[in-house]
Amino acid sequence: MFALDSIVGKHINYALDKTQHLPNKINNSITNTEIILQDYQYFASRIFIGLKNLNSMLLFWDTGTGKTLTAVYIIKYIKELFPRWIILIFIKKSLYVDPWLNTISSYISDTSNIKFIYYDSTSSLDKFNNIYRSIESSLNKKNRLLIIIDEVHKLISRSVKKDNSERNFTPIYRKLIKLANYENNKILCMSATPITNNIAEFNNLIGLLRPNVMNIKEEYINNGKLINFKEIRETLLGICSYKRLIEADSLTDTNYIDGYAKKSIFYHNIIMSDEQSKLYNMAERYDYKTELGGLKTMRRLISSFAFYDLKIKGDLDNVEYNEMIKRKLAEFSEFTKNINFSKEFINAFKNNEIKTKTDLLITDINNYNILYQYSCKYIEACRIILNSRGKVLLFEPLVNFEGISSLKYYFNCFNISYIEYSSKTIKMRDNDLNYYNNYENNDGNKIKVCIFSYAGSEGISFKCINDIIILDMPWNESELKQIIGRSIRLNSHEYLPINYRYVNVHFIISYSNNRKSVDKEILDIIKNKQGKINVVFDLLKASPIEIIHNMYKYIEPVDNEIIFETIRKTRMKEMNISNVIINLKLYPITYCKDYDRATILKGLLNKDTNIIYDNDTPVAILLVDNNNLPIFVIENDILIYITNDYY
């Protein structure tokens, strides 16, 4: 295995030699300032630009680590490899102005060769189909193509078969493969979470980056690990650049480290009112009868908000149903206009003292009980917000009646200031966001809350957030990571005192009075999905250019490129599924990675080799001092060994 690693290492050094003249900074022509790239940004850019035959790369970098700026740097300097390029950038439509257009306009003077395609817009995809032939015919000795795909997991998920049926996006996916692998073209994909749902997405991602080299099946996973891991890894060497300061997933606490805020997870288990529980049970029966029952649609709606006489859709057509929703929202708006809780009641509510205080206004108590009857979630969200010392983000994917529209009335009742970042606020949301992120609002004194839907779940940065509330669960951990990543980004808390550099993540899990919960069901789905996804993530994390370079930093570079052309044409060997039993004496230990001391892990140590195992797979190796003794720290009376990655 390591013979191939060393050859790739020689190619990396070849690229570094070839690009040593490239600057490590990029000039912002609008502000007339220079931005110095981080070492990892500069390194990945030079490898991608410096190796002609490395036609594809995945930037598997955490949220907030500068993927967009790195892509713009590559666009600016790829002419060092060849003078004439067509740049095709695939993005979500909502990310066009910020960050993409703003960043490109700041650093690149001539943008005439850059074309944007929105992969979440039918008309934009039609445009791509129309220009596909002209792009294909223009690729010759005079022109080359660079394809950049932002948040590539969004594009890949649209290409995976659903119920064994081909998706509408599949023909475009095939065209991208053809264009990307045309001689001398390049493709750069970017994502903090490149796989979101299943192994099929991983195969399609690899199919885009290195077509036909592999096809992993779920039966290749044994006890949470890939069999023949090393052989599979060889087909992926150098396929990605990997950057993560904190390895923990979205559901794990982390400490403050290297500019990233501390993260603490809180679960709020709350009980619906009898009326909300009754409607929830109706919704459950409705979901089971419909084709979309697997999406748990009605239960999710009712778990958020259940107006007292709002019944399940039944036989209403869409027009009738939407008209009913408008009427109910108008009724609820009219009802809440007269609610303005007193300061005494709000203080009692914050401190969970409503039942013990005897001097509260009866009107406040009655109004509170009615609001709780409609939504235990919104009530709990208001309590969390009122107890937060600083700014709060609230994720609510539902924009209409059972979501943001009704939630805002609760905020009005409790005198909570807010802005909304959703598909309904396109004209004003960027200005509102700038005001919310303004230095004078670092503690939320002017605007306390930003409510955001999926429109703000990726590519948007929030500053100085202390609490984030998840009102409705996404379907996978990758989306959850993106959502939480809006609040924890590199240096996002630098203007707060050190003791305020934290984010509390609140999951509100609502239960009916007979202990049923769609929130808990989806949370369990997230955990089950992530187990398989972590298997292929481990594969990517074992093969990036950084690990190979660290192993062979001082090896002589090659004279000419050869290896990536060979790897792209070498298909993975058939899997050997036979069981091989090796007996090792292992000892349970607690450890952390040297580059991520915030995440504490459990493992099994082989004292003879200093290798740490997770089940039967080596995952780390002890760091030792000059006397060959393990390096460790003691925190809270726990001995924690310091390690590096095994690969």
UniProtKB/Swiss-Prot annotation:
Q: Which reaction does it catalyse?
A: a ribonucleoside 5'-triphosphate + H2O = a ribonucleoside 5'-diphosphate + phosphate + H(+)
- Occurrences of domain Helicase ATP-binding (ranges): 48-212
- The UniProt annotation puts motif DEXH box at 150-153
Q: What is its EC number?
A: 3.6.1.15
Recite the UniProt keywords alphabetically: ATP-binding, DNA-binding, Hydrolase, Nucleotide-binding, Transcription, Virion
One Pfam assignment: SNF2-rel_dom
Q: Write out the ranges of the annotated region (Binding to the cap-specific mRNA (nucleoside-2'-O-)-methyltransferase).
A: 467-533
Disulfides per UniProt:
none
For the ligand (ATP), the binding residues are 61-68
Q: Name one GO molecular function term.
A: ATP binding
The record's annotation in InterPro entries points to: Helicase_ATP-bd, Helicase_C-like, NPHI_C, P-loop_NTPase, SNF2_N
Localization terms from the record: Virion
Report the residue ranges that make up the Helicase C-terminal domain in this protein. Answer: 378-541
Concerning SMART domains, the annotation shows:
DEXDc, HELICc
Question: One cellular component GO annotation, for this chain's record?
Answer: virion component
Q: Name one GO biological process term.
A: DNA-templated transcription
Assembly notes: Monomer. Interacts (via C-terminus) with RAP94 (via N-terminus). Interacts with the cap-specific mRNA (nucleoside-2'-O-)-methyltransferase.
Q: What does this protein do?
A: DNA-dependent ATPase required for providing the needed energy to achieve the termination of early transcripts. Acts in concert with the RAP94 subunit of the virion RNA polymerase and the capping enzyme/VTF to catalyze release of UUUUUNU-containing nascent RNA from the elongation complex. NPH-I must bind ssDNA in order to exhibit ATPase activity.
Family statement drawn from the similarity comment of this UniProt entry: Belongs to the helicase family. NPH I subfamily.
Supply the name of the protein. Answer: Nucleoside triphosphatase I
The organism named in the record is: Choristoneura fumiferana entomopoxvirus (CfEPV)
